[in-house]
Amino acid sequence: MSSIGKEDIYESDGAASQVQKSEPENDNPTHPDIELISVDVDEALKKYKNRVLNLTSSDFSDSIAKKRRHAFGNNQYVLEVTGAGFSGTETAAEKLNRILYEVADLNEQIRADENLKTDLLNAEVLENLEKEVKTLQVAQSNGKTARVEHDVELPNVRTDSKVATLENRLRRIEQVIGSSVIPSAPVLDTIEDLKLRCETLNHSYVSGLEQRLNMMLTKLEKIDETRANNDIDENLDKKVDEILELMQKWDVACSSLPSNVNKVKALNRLHEQVQHFAGGLSHLKTIREKLEKEVAQGREAIIEYESQGKQEIGSVVEKLKLLEAKVADLK
């Protein structure tokens, strides 16, 4: 059943599109389904202040699905802005709302066109200004006239422009008065120099410098005493010079050390390749000796085979001659 006491009807796509005419509801306040309540206007104003009735994401037709139906939200706000033709006096709240609206409009214009950005008009300055206005609105809503301690953080270009104007005025005054020496250093550098000089004139700073100088003097005196007590050799300077020369030579050697190491590594690799080549060459030499021995043995065998063949051929020829003689005798 729905919240108003009627059934939920779900129709398929193929159902007929005939809509039954619903009976007009009885708007009689004495109807048993109507509950009469009393509403406190002040409490309702406190509860629903700055809230807007938004039904875009709410669905009251379905009572089966368990959904949270919150129609009131504070994600939207209404700005009370008076137009140019408004003849009445503009209140403080309306002025603050108008400033917020103009700041939002400026933000949109800057986002749409980057060329509108300047050193005095950018997203950071507008954000700080919006924070200021919101703090003022909060203070006004709370009924307090507290002083806002937050300062709008403007870029350094404004101070630089002020310094530039101050420098120009000083230059004009110096030119009008007729100063003999016109300084070329900027005012900020001159101020920093004066600050440093004033700090050097500070009693605590001067006393600290005096303590450091006294400590250095005592250390130097101790070093002189140790040198006098130890009777340093005259040859110490020569030894120090020799060590210095050795260190200089070592610096040169250190500078050429990586290239020398690379050369040694290359020679080592070449030596390994030579050893490998020598092993292969000795192996080939042994193979050659074996082949020469086998060739010599083959030649000897061929010579023996030729001599034996000649003997056999001679014996065969003699036997053929004997056979021919016997055949001739038989004829």
From Swiss-Prot:
Subunit comment: Subunit of dynactin, a multiprotein complex part of a tripartite complex with dynein and a adapter, such as BICDL1, BICD2 or HOOK3. The dynactin complex is built around ACTR1A/ACTB filament and consists of an actin-related filament composed of a shoulder domain, a pointed end and a barbed end. Its length is defined by its flexible shoulder domain. The soulder is composed of 2 DCTN1 subunits, 4 DCTN2 and 2 DCTN3.
Any one biological process term the GO annotation gives: centrosomal and pronuclear rotation
The organism's place on the tree of life at top rank: Eukaryota
Family: Belongs to the dynactin subunit 2 family.
InterPro entries xrefs: Dynamitin
PANTHER family reported in the protein's UniProt record: DYNACTIN SUBUNIT
Main location: cytoplasm
Name under which the protein is recorded: Probable dynactin subunit 2
Ranges in a coiled coil: 90-123, 209-249, 280-331
Function: Part of the dynactin complex that activates the molecular motor dynein for ultra-processive transport along microtubules. In the dynactin soulder domain, binds the ACTR1A filament and acts as a molecular ruler to determine the length. Modulates cytoplasmic dynein binding to an organelle, and plays a role in prometaphase chromosome alignment and spindle organization during mitosis. Involved in anchoring microtubules to centrosomes.
Basic and acidic residues biased stretches: 22-33
Keyword Chloroplast included in the entry's annotation: no
UniProt membrane topology term: Peripheral membrane protein
UniProt-annotated stretches for the region Disordered: 1-33
Native source species: Caenorhabditis elegans
Keyword Cytoplasm tagged: yes
GN (gene name): dnc-2
Gene Ontology cellular-component terms listed: centrosome; cytoplasm; dynactin complex; dynein complex; kinetochore; membrane; nucleus; pericentriolar material
Cellular localization per UniProt: Cytoplasm, Cytoskeleton, Microtubule organizing center, Centrosome; Membrane; Cytoplasm, Cytoskeleton
Annotated TM spans: none
Pfam families per the UniProt record, alphabetical: Dynamitin (PF04912)
Keywords of this entry: Coiled coil, Cytoplasm, Cytoskeleton, Dynein, Membrane, Microtubule
